[in-house]
């Protein structure tokens, strides 16, 4: 490792390049075979035009995006860090959307400025390396306590804890195995590490104000169920924990808005939800330690969609936009052989053969432990290509073989035409294959490396004693 401000020798790579062991190793390496011209030219045959349906496009869009940053407390002691997570929520309504676009691929800057009035940003401040919060004993406990407090403070009504993100988390956790609407099970106590065996299960009950471990008596927090505290370290960077937390919070916020609408508009929630679509930056998936919550979101949306269908309404509209990755690379490779306006529901077979080149595919389905949405590939009417994700219309993945087949059957997704129409409408020229909702959400949430992060560094230094 270099000293601070020490620069590397500009010719130090020569020893590596000329090392005979390295040369021999590189000679044995070979790339995974590329798609041949026939594979590329025939790929477009799998695409088709989406079927029309009787559902209308929504007038309201909620776009959610987040970013995180680890700020150093002192220049002299850069290993003392505070974590910042910012998740922005933008509400775009029919009139504002038409004003932004103005019939052009270029956005109207004056209309964009007005959108700021409907922008809501949620900030989470979490202790990271070498920082202890309140009366906690170490960084891990500090992270847990701070996260739980901030989930509780994020409320729609300040005097009603039932409107908090924490209550939404409890409801989602109740869908986990061994849990119900009155109690949830945590994987293990963060202090004594008991709870993993059948005879020492640890529950947190709905009305517990200050739950404690029955084995060691230490304080537990509802947010412990997310397990994002597990990789938190005292003396190393905690960017992994911050990233996992941001990922699950973005998706949990969408569910929180849905729950709020359902519970506060008991007579008209179906009409409201039918006229609303959530845009989420990234796939509909939960990664890392909280991954099991993908199944909770899947079950909740399935149950709600059953009610929506009984009322002759569209399924909940939620779309994850994937801006990069292997599927995007594949789509860009074959896009010239796809007609404008055509869409494809990606199967595991095609993914394994042409995207991941997995010749020994497992019996499990792609994203079994993480995804609650299906990948679609689309070339819009302007010729731009998008990889997007929509919720699975199934309750669970228990019958893997059947799920693997049915998830890639486009006929199971009743509102694909709505999604493709939205991708036509919101296409903009600000970035390559950019969409207005995701661009705006990122605009108001991104913590830029400078000057945004510099401000957070200064804030951390001035507030911590």
Predicted features by range, described:
Residues 1-59, 113-465:
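Long, contiguous domain-sized segments
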Residues 54, 67-69:
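Alpha-helical structural signal
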Residues 60-67:
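Two-metal-ion RNase H-like nuclease active-site motif
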Residues 72-131:
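Acidic, metal-ligating active-site segments
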């Amino acid at each position: 490792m270099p000293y601070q401000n020490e620069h590397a020798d500009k010719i130090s790579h020569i020893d590596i390049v000329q090392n005979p062991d390295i040369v021999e190793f590189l000679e044995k390496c070979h790339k995974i075979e590329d798609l041949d011209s026939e594979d590329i030219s025939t790929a477009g045959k799998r695409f088709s035009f989406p079927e029309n349906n009787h559902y209308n496009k929504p007038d309201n869009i909620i776009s959610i995006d987040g970013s995180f940053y680890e700020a150093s407390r002192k220049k002299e002691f850069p290993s003392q860090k505070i974590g910042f997570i910012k998740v922005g929520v933008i509400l775009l309504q029919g009139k504002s959307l038409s004003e932004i676009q103005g019939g052009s691929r270029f956005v109207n800057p004056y209309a964009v400025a007005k959108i700021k009035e409907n922008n809501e940003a949620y900030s989470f401040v979490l202790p990271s390396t070498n920082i202890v919060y309140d009366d906690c004993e170490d960084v891990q406990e500090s992270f847990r306590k701070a996260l739980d407090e901030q989930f509780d403070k994020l409320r729609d009504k300040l005097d009603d804890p039932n409107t908090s993100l924490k209550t939404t988390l409890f409801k989602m956790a109740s869908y986990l195995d061994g849990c119900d609407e009155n109690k949830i099970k945590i994987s293990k106590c963060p202090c004594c590490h008991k709870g993993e065996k059948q005879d020492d299960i640890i529950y947190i009950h709905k009305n517990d104000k200050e739950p404690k471990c029955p084995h060691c008596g230490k304080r537990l927090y509802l947010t412990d169920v997310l397990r994002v505290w597990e990789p938190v370290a005292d003396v190393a960077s905690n960017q992994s924990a911050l990233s996992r937390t941001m990922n699950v919070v973005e998706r949990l916020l969408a569910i929180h808005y849905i729950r709020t609408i359902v519970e506060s508009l008991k007579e008209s929630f179906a009409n409201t939800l039918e006229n609303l679509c959530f845009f989420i930056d990234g796939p509909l998936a939960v990664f890392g330690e909280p991954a099991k919550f993908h199944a909770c979101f899947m079950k909740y949306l399935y149950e709600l969609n059953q009610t929506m269908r009984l009322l002759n309404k569209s399924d909940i509209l939620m779309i994850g936009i994937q801006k990069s990755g292997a599927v995007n690379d594949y789509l860009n490779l074959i896009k010239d052989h796809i007609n404008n306006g055509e869409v494809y529901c990606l199967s595991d077979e095609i993914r394994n053969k042409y995207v991941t080149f997995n010749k020994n595919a497992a019996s499990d389905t792609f994203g079994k432990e993480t995804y609650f949405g299906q990948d679609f590939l689309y070339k819009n009417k302007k010729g731009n290509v998008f990889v997007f994700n929509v919720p699975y219309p199934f309750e669970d993945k228990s019958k893997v073989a059947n799920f693997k087949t049915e998830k890639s059957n486009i006929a199971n997704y009743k509102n694909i035409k709505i999604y493709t129409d939205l991708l036509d409408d919101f296409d903009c020229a600000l970035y390559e294959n950019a969409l207005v909702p995701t661009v705006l959400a990122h605009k108001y949430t991104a913590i830029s490396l400078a000057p945004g992060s510099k401000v957070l560094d200064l804030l951390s230094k001035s507030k911590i004693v």
